[in-house]
Amino acid sequence: MCSTMTATMNQTICEKQNITMDLLRSPIQIPSASDTIKIETPSTISSQPSPIQTPLAAASSDNFERPSLSYKDLIIEAIDRSPEKRLKLNEIYQVIRLLHPYYRHRPDQWGWQNSIRHNLSLHDCFVKLPLKQTSASGVVGHFWTVVPELSDKQTLRRRNRQQPRALAKKSDAGRTLSRDDRGSSGSGETSPSPSQPSISPPNENPMPSVQALNVLELLSGMNDYKGTLFQNNYRTNLIQDNSAVNGLQNLLTTTLMQINPQLGALLSLANLNNLTTNQLQIASPSLSPIKAESQSFLLQ
């Protein structure tokens, strides 16, 4: 029995040794760097690129024609394409990239986006609409919309910005003219230059308005002045008739009618002819009233 067990163990040991020798004799294959590892992918995964991915570096804006629209028209086009006719700033960028590949493939994305922001703040046809909700960072955003009535007109914001500049230019021009006038007066020149109009100083005593004139006082003063003029001329024997008085009357009447044509009725009521020859009974200048009185007294 012992001999049988010993023979079985020897046979098992021999078989193991044979298997070990066979493994040592077989060549061992080591993979090289040139070998590729093939990994099978599921058939459900598509090999087409996603439209959200960044364009390849090989594509550039040189391969696409730049649109002829201005930045203002690009913004209006993007907002009109939206269903609610309003877009956020990033949405305006996305619509412009989608409609015009030139801006999608431009390397300087910040350049044309900065121009979009500038035109939004420049033209008054673009209006901000506040958002009702806030973003995750707590920043309140806003929509941009277009006012159709102002889309075809010039911007009011640009005119408002130019008005202070225009006023400053006018004030500078006025100061330059005043300096030129002082220089010309100091050098003895009397005639102003034809290219530089003369600026007259404002009148310190402005004329009163027609409404402030007291017509009755003016007419009464005119009659007093006529009487004084007649007496002075009579005493000095300078006039033989009342032609000077009538000329003064006609001059004053014409002046008043030019100031206000409605004074004709008042002039007729004032009785401007109360100092004519028929009423004043002019005596001969050769004999004064005092001498005539003394002669009549002596005759009595």
UniProtKB/Swiss-Prot annotation:
Residue range(s) of DNA binding per entry: 66-161
Region forming the signal peptide: none
Coiled-coil spans in chain: none
Region (Disordered): 153-208
InterPro entries linked: Fork_head_dom (IPR001766), FOX_domain-containing (IPR050211), TF_fork_head_CS_2 (IPR030456), WH-like_DNA-bd_sf (IPR036388), WH_DNA-bd_sf (IPR036390)
PANTHER family, per database record: FORKHEAD BOX PROTEIN, FORKHEAD BOX PROTEIN L2
Any single GO BP term: cell differentiation
Name of the protein this chain belongs to: Forkhead transcription factor fkh-9
Tissue and organ expression note: Expressed in mechanosensory neurons.
Organism: Caenorhabditis elegans
Record keywords: DNA-binding, Nucleus
Example of a GO MF term: DNA-binding transcription factor activity, RNA polymerase II-specific
Compositional bias of kind Basic and acidic residues: 169-183
Function: Transcription factor. Binds to the regulatory elements of genes that contain the sequence motif 5'-TTGTTTCT-3'. Involved in regulating intestinal transcription of vitellogenin vit-2, acting in concert with transcription factors elt-2, mab-3 and daf-16, and also the TGF-beta/Sma/Mab pathway. Functions downstream of the insulin/IGF-1-like signaling (IIS) mediated pathway, in regeneration of axons after injury and in short-term memory, perhaps acting in neurons, and in modulation of longevity, perhaps acting non-neuronally.
Keyword DNA-binding listed: yes
Gene deletion effect: RNAi-mediated knockdown severely impairs axon regeneration in a daf-2 mutant background, in a daf-16-dependent-manner. Impairs short-term associative memory in a daf-2 mutant background in a daf-16-dependent-manner. Reduces longevity in a daf-2 mutant background.
Location(s) in or outside the cell: Nucleus
GO cellular component, one term: nucleus
Source species, domain of life: Eukaryota
Predominant localisation class: nucleus
Biased composition (Low complexity): 187-198
Pfam families: Forkhead
